[in-house]
Regions:
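C-terminal, well-structured subdomains that either form a transmembrane helix-short loop-helix hairpin
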Residues: 249-269
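Beta-strand secondary-structure signal
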Residues: 78, 90, 164, 251, ...
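Beta-rich interaction modules in large eukaryotic scaffold/regulatory proteins
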Residues: 117-151, 291-324
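Juxtadomain low-complexity/linker regions and immediately adjacent membrane-anchoring helices
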Residues: 1-71, 89, 97-128, 144, ...
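Short beta-strands within extracellular/lumenal beta-sheet-rich domains
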Residues: 70-83, 237-256
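Helix-boundary capping/turn motifs
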Residues: 80-86, 228-231, 253-258, 328
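N-terminal low-complexity, intrinsically disordered tails enriched in Ser/Pro/Gly
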Residues: 76-80, 85, 92-98, 111
Length: 356
């Protein structure tokens, strides 16, 4: 089902763009990228334009652009997800700033070849690979605009690891976005008491930012990304508040429900705009009902004791002694809420514990 450009963000609000280099996704191969690298398809930020800027091959473009006069029906690029596998609910092909040189049609194919399947990346990247399933048949694209499609239940409930984007007949696409949820790696076959501590909130494990009070500068989904990032642009920053008693908040659905043994809140790169303090609450599995929990739901319980003061450009680690439970909180949490007092920015929000 096609999704209007103005509705894409709303329709896929509770998903993650898994076709992002921030989530370790990468281009395995492409038919051609003479004018602009296929790697640009996976850039997490919107495409930019630099009119009048030329490089050796011609005009500079922030996207994937192939040479003219393709002798084949289409150009192609093969993408490997950075997560173990994922359920994909929809796709977006963005032709931003490609006007006289955009690809006229887009097609998306996928396959499931997890680690240990016996199918290698080299085999999948080969043009002769026959294991592709078409998720989106060749569909028209227009100049400098977002194009979205939502998949049916059969597709969105099937796991995939690799994708192939076809561009008819040649030209340029700015971005590819694959909206869905990461599937966590399977749990080790050991006793629960010996279960390893994992990052329950990570986008790599299926964590999703469901809602936030404010995302004026950057989205709350950034706080679930792996690593510490490169600059302030890949964290979450809210607008300045003026009202007394104001707080900002973000609600996260854990990719892995479980106990909590450690919380990390990182203000890396936030130096004049970090929050004065933070609070961390959780919802015990089943307590919040279906859908997106309200920020003022009475079922939120304190995970970290009280308000914790923050510092600039610092990774704040709250261990067992900082937890309200006085040690590992063995309740099974499904959601967590990070509150900024009164506002500001954080780079990462990490919940560590043992999956249920």
């Amino acid at each position: 089902m096609q999704v209007a450009a103005t509705d894409i963000d709303q329709v896929f609000a509770h998903t993650t763009n898994l076709a992002s280099c921030n989530l370790n996704s990468k281009i395995l191969a492409c038919s051609n990228d003479y004018f602009a690298s296929a790697d640009n398809l996976l850039t997490p930020t919107p495409s930019i334009s630099r009119p009048g800027v030329f490089v050796h091959t011609g005009a500079w473009y922030d996207g994937w652009e192939t040479r003219r006069h393709n002798p084949d029906p289409y150009d192609w690029a093969v993408i490997k997800l950075g997560v173990a596998a994922a359920y994909i609910h929809g796709v977006e092909v963005d032709t931003a700033h490609f006007i006289g040189n955009y690809g006229e049609k887009a097609e998306l194919q996928a396959t499931h070849a997890p680690e240990g399947s016996g199918v290698t990346d080299a085999q999948i990247a080969d043009p002769s690979f026959a294991g592709w399933k078409t998720l989106l048949p060749a569909s028209p694209c227009g100049p400098s605009q977002r194009h979205g499609w939502k998949f049916d239940a059969e597709i969105s409930q099937t796991p995939y690891t690799h994708f192939r984007l076809l561009m008819y007949p040649d030209g340029g696409f700015a971005r590819l976005r694959l909206y869905g949820h990461a599937i966590p790696p399977p749990a080790p076959a050991i006793q629960a008491a010996s279960a390893p501590v994992e990052e329950l909130s990570s986008a790599l494990n299926g964590g999703v930012a469901l809602a936030a009070s404010d995302e004026h500068f950057t989205p709350s989904s950034n706080i679930l990304l792996p690593g510490r990032g490169k600059d302030m642009g890949d964290g979450w920053e809210t607008a300045r508040s003026r009202a007394a008693g104001h707080v900002d908040w973000a609600i996260v659905k854990l990719g892995l429900s479980g106990s909590v043994s450690k919380v990390v809140i990182d203000t890396k790169d936030f130096r004049g705009n970090f929050p004065r303090a933070v609070r961390v609450h959780g919802l015990v599995a089943g307590a919040g009902g279906d859908g997106v929990p309200s920020a003022d739901d009475a079922n939120w319980v304190e995970i970290v004791k009280g308000d914790k003061r923050c510092q600039a450009d610092t990774e704040h680690i709250f261990g067992p002694d900082d937890l309200t439970a006085g040690g590992e909180d063995t309740r099974v949490f499904s959601h967590v809420k990070l509150t900024l007092v009164p506002d500001g920015g954080v780079k990462r929000f990490r919940i560590f514990g043992r999956r249920a």
